[in-house]
Every structure is written in structure tokens, then in C-alpha cells.
């Protein structure tokens, strides 16, 4: 019997060798090396976490948090290092989405006859 986790671990290892992963690692390093960008990224990450927690608990986002998000988003859009990081991250997630489609195909195929 196959150990699927061995395959998953190999996939994770292989992922680190892709151009997309390497580009993201470089983009993260660029942000880390710029104090302003790193601080802005941390602030953005903390606010996004707060927003997600509010959504998960069904609590409305305060006007203060909405304004903070808008202001922070404006700052992020003007920070070339973070914009580059986010674009690079998106490229990696597109690759991961393609991989997910590949390993989900057998499951989708099981249901194909039911969908007809």
C-alpha cells in the first residue's frame, strides 16, 4: 500500500525547487531587508488576521478598522516591494491551484457518471 504522505512530502520538497517558489523567497527577502516595507507588511498581516477573525465570529468590522484597512491598502499599493511580493505570491498560488486540480482529478472523475 502506498504512503500518500511520502508523496505529499516529496511534492512539498519539489515545490521549493520551482521558479515560482524561488521568486517568492527572493521577494520576501527584499521586503525583509527594507525596514519600511517589512513594518508595513507586518501591519497589513496583523490587520488581515483581525479582519478574518471578525468574519469568522460573525462580528461586523468597525468603521475604524474599515478606514484603517483602506488607508493601509493605499500604502501597500504604493510600496513597490510589497506589490512585487504579492504579485509573486499570486503566481505561486496559481501553480498550487494547478497542482490541486491534478491531484483532485481522480476524485472528480469518480463523480462524473453521477453528473450526467
UniProtKB/Swiss-Prot annotation:
Q: What is this protein called?
A: UPF0342 protein LBA1592
- Family per record: Belongs to the UPF0342 family.
Which species expresses this protein natively? Answer: Lactobacillus acidophilus (strain ATCC 700396 / NCK56 / N2 / NCFM)
Ranked from the top, the taxonomy reads: Bacteria, Bacillati, Bacillota, Bacilli, Lactobacillales
InterPro entries in the record: Com_YlbF, YheA/YmcA-like_dom_sf
Tell me which HAMAP family the record gives: UPF0342
Organism superkingdom = Bacteria
